[in-house]
Amino acid sequence: MGIKILQPFYLGTRQVNLRKARDVKGPDDLKGVKLRVPGGPGWLALARGLGVSPTPMAMPEVYLALSTGTIDGQENPLSIMRANKLEEVTQQIVLTSHLVQPVFLAMALPIWNKLSADDQAKAMAAAKVAADANDKARIAEEKSIVDELQAKGLKIARPDTALFRKAVMAQYESSGLKAKWPAGMYERIEQVK
């Protein structure tokens, strides 16, 4: 790809945001919900694992689609929900924690290759410091967003996330997407916990 990834940064854990509140304990409770997802085979499989009817849609269309009832909900990290003011057109956050969303600090590989070994080491160290500060702030922000949205009247559902994890993994396996992963990758990811 011609890039050097310096460090992953934590963007947030993706949660479900619903237009109308409902009792949600597991994926079966979301059956029939038209949920906005970014699109693509992986996102569609993930959404089906959540129990919803996936509705691919660009993020700029989500606020209007929620306000008119075109979709019943969407999923994103809490910071994205708040930045887009989705609490104005929704009633509930369902803390499914179905995906941890990273972003990556990267540099063009031709530029990286022009740096001295010392400058490369300094860039990597600075990226690590920045990622640590970001990650700590994002985790604290997520807690404050839940508290803030609950204070504004949004209902917060805390379902059994193990039920969602099991359903999503079954969907990935049956879709054939997991088979495309390098051998042992899933097991390595599971060990990160």
Residue ranges and their predicted role:
Residues 3-193:
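N-terminal secretory/targeting leader peptides
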